[in-house]
C-alpha cells in the first residue's frame, strides 16, 4: 500500500482445468452469486493455519461494497479495508473507517454477514495524536476486527499496548520501503518497538516492500519469528527498485516459493493477506493467480 499515492470446490476444479482465467469468470458472476455466502477457495491453506485475506487497497479503483463482490467470486472471505478508501458508490466521500455513523456501521456489518465475510483486519490511522485511538478500537471491536495494521510512531506504543489488552485486539506493525520513508523498513526496527510489549503487538511484514528495499524477504521473516501477527503477501518485478510494480506471486524477485516455505518452517499460523498494488487491466486475474499460488503450495504440505 502506498498511502501517499491515493491518486474456491468450484474454484479448485476451475483452476485445475483452466487456470486463473476460470476464476476470473467466476468472480464476474458465477461461483458465489450475489447475496449468497462466499464459497471458500483455499481449503488447503486453511488446514495449515493460513487464513487468506485481501487488503482492499488492491481494489482502490472501486468501493468497499463493489470489491466485496469481486472477493466473493474469488472465494476470499476476509477483508482488510484501509481508513482512506471509499465505502459505497452512492456516497463516494464516505470512507470505510471509524468515522462511519452508527447506521452506516450496522449496514456494513449486515452486508458482511449476509455474504459470510469478515473484516479480519483494518489498516488504521494510528499516528502521534493518541486522542482518536479509542474511537479506532471501538470501531474495530464493533466490526469484529482481530488485528489493526498500522505504522505508529514509537512514543505511542505504551498507550496502544494498553488498548490492545483492554479490547483483546492485536496491533500488527506494517512496513513500507526505506525509500518511502518507512520507520519499519527493516525487521529490526519492528522488533525494537515490540521490546517490553505484550504479544498483542507484533509485525505485519510486507514482503514486496522488503524486495523494493533490496532485502531478502525470507531472511526478514526469519528475524521476525515468534513476533509475526499477519503477513502481507506481495511480489514485485525488480529487486532494490522502490518504484517496481507488483506482479502475481511467484513471478517476481521475492522467490515466493521460498517465502511460503519459510512461513511454513516458522510454523506461522494467522492471516495471510494478498495486497496487489498494480492496477492492471487484468487486475482480478492477477489476484486470482496470487490466490492459486498460495493454495497450490498449501496443497503440497503434509498436515
Predicted features, each with a name:
Residues 2-56, 60-77, 141, 187, ...:
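Histidine-acidic metal/acid-base catalytic patches
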Residues 10, 15-16, 20-23, 44, ...:
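Active-site acidic/histidine proton-transfer and metal-coordination neighborhood
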Residues 58, 82-83, 123, 175:
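Residue-level recognition of beta-strand->loop/alpha-helix junctions
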Residues 80-81, 121, 149, 273:
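Structural recognition of the beta-strand scaffold that forms the well-ordered cores
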Residues 82-107:
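Glycine-rich, proline-tolerant flexible connector loops at the mouths of alpha/beta enzymes
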Residues 84, 127, 153, 236, ...:
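Flexible loop residues that form catalytic
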Residues 87-93, 180, 212, 239-244:
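A short acidic, helix-capping loop that chelates divalent metal ions and anchors anionic groups
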Amino acid at each position: 500500500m502506498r498511502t501517499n499515492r491515493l491518486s474456491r470446490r468450484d474454484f479448485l476444479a476451475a483452476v485445475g482445468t483452466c487456470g486463473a482465467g476460470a476464476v476470473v469468470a467466476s468472480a464476474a458472476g458465477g461461483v458465489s452469486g450475489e447475496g449468497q455466502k462466499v464459497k471458500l477457495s483455499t481449503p488447503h491453506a486453511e488446514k495449515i493455519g493460513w487464513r487468506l485475506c485481501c487488503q482492499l487497497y488492491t481494489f482502490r479503483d472501486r468501493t468497499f461494497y463493489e470489491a466485496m463482490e469481486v472477493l466473493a467470486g474469488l472465494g476470499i472471505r476476509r477483508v482488510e479495508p484501509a481508513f482512506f478508501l471509499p465505502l459505497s458508490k452512492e456516497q463516494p466521500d464516505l470512507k470505510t473507517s471509524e468515522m462511519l455513523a452508527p447506521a452506516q456501521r450496522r449496514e456494513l456489518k449486515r452486508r458482511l454477514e449476509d455474504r459470510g465475510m469478515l473484516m479480519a483486519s483494518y489498516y488504521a490511522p494510528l499516528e502521534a495524536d493518541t486522542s482518536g485511538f479509542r474511537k479506532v478500537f471501538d470501531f474495530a471491536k464493533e466490526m469484529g476486527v482481530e488485528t489493526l495494521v498500522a505504522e505508529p510512531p514509537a512514543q505511542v506504543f505504551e498507550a496502544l499496548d494498553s488498548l490492545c489488552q483492554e479490547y483483546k485486539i492485536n496491533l500488527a506493525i506494517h512496513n513500507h520501503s526505506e525509500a518511502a520513508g518507512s520507520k519499519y523498513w527493516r525487521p529490526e526496527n519492528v522488533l525494537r518497538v515490540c521490546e517490553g510489549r505484550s504479544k498483542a503487538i507484533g509485525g505485519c511484514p510486507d514482503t514486496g516492500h522488503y524486495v523494493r528495499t533490496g532485502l531478502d524477504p525470507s531472511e526478514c521473516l526469519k528475524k521476525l519469528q515468534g513476533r509475526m501477527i499477519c503477513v502481507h503477501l506481495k511480489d514485485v518485478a525488480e529487486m532494490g527498485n522502490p518504484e517496481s510494480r507488483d506482479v502475481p506471486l511467484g513471478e517476481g524477485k521475492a522467490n515466493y516459493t521460498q517465502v511460503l516455505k519459510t512461513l511454513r518452517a516458522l510454523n506461522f499460523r494467522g492471516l495471510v493477506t494478498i495486497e496487489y498494488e498494480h492496477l492492471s487491466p487484468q487486475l482480478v486475474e492477477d489476484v486470482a493467480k496470487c490466490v492459486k499460488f498460495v493454495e497450490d503450495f498449501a496443497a503440497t504440505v503434509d498436515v
